[in-house]
Amino acid sequence: MPRKLSSIAPDWWDYTTLDDDIIQAAARLTPEKMLKLARRGFKVVLYDTLEEFYLAEALEYITAWKQSTEDNPVGICGPIGPTEQLPLVARLVNDLNLDVRSAHFWGMDEWFDTATGREVPVTHPLSFERADRALCFSRIRRALRMPDAHLHFPRADTRDYRASWDTGVRCAVMQGGQGDVKHWAFNDPLPRKGRHKDAPPSPAEYRKLTTRVVDLHPLTIAQNARTSGGGNIAMVPTRAITVGPVETWKAEKVSIWHAGHHDNPFGQRLTAFMVSKRIVDTSVPMSLLADHPNVQFNYFRGGIGTCDVEMH
């Protein structure tokens, strides 16, 4: 039987093309049942307050960077979305007088400007590099801060960024949020065309993707307008540069942070269910993490919500 057409964008793959049994099973999950989805290689953590949630996220930076030395440098790959952890990272480094000069940081993704064929400049209001620098790195005291050469931001020419993953720097953890389309970074589902017209790419095919320029699923564009631009879809680029699965599998741990601001109650349940049950389908890119050896999903309990029907 052919796969369903997307309910959102018929020319694309996404989670609405999944079997109804998966959809219904995920929607039935309570927070307590989500905790029980944990298995070897997949940990589920719930935080009762946002303060605890974002502090725990910030501490992953500190824990990674404290391991770094000049001879054995260590880094973390981090997202924009969420961002609330970033000022906490800078405050912790400064207040603990933590020397992170040997440490590294990889940005996960960046917007692509189709007019110039390059990444958006840091002057762009939605620039992820701009946000990382303004919210975190420019706030760390210069005497403690790593040099610019240790900050790796994706560019349209991805060669230097991809090479930075193979220079002997250990990535202790890759953090991420989860978008409405169930991506990490901008690893979106692919368009439904060509050899992928009748079936999405196989997991093995998707896993071969490296850092690259991508076309964004319409749901991703709408989400970023909602979360970052007051709903102004026209200001959101339609293409982006994203870290790929190849780089993701070079991280010792993948840590996904669900505050309830980005993906919705159903999405937060769906990906945990698929990762736990090892249901890997590239129409839900986050499900590929089922095959990573060390994944942790972190939830703010107050942001998990419910999939019960409520009319507004």
What are these regions (language model features)?
Residues 185-237:
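Class I SAM-dependent methyltransferase SAM-binding "motif I" and its flanking Rossmann-like core
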Residues 76-86, 177-183, 261-263:
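Gly/Ser/Thr-rich loops at beta-strand to alpha-helix junctions
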Residues 23-45, 98-175, 235, 299:
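Ligand-binding beta-strand-loop-alpha-helix segment within the catalytic cores
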Residues 89-100, 122-124, 189-198:
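A glycine- and small-aliphatic-rich helix-loop capping segment at beta-alpha/alpha-beta transitions
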Residues 2-17, 36, 41-42, 47-49, ...:
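ATP/nucleoside-binding phosphotransfer catalytic cores, i.e., glycine-rich phosphate-binding loops
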Residues 66-97:
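Glycine-rich N-terminal segment of FAD-binding domains in flavoprotein oxidoreductases
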Residues 58-72, 248-249:
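Glycine-rich phosphate/diphosphate-binding loops that line cofactor/substrate pockets in enzymes
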Residues 59, 154-198:
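ATP/pyrophosphate-binding catalytic subdomain of soluble kinases
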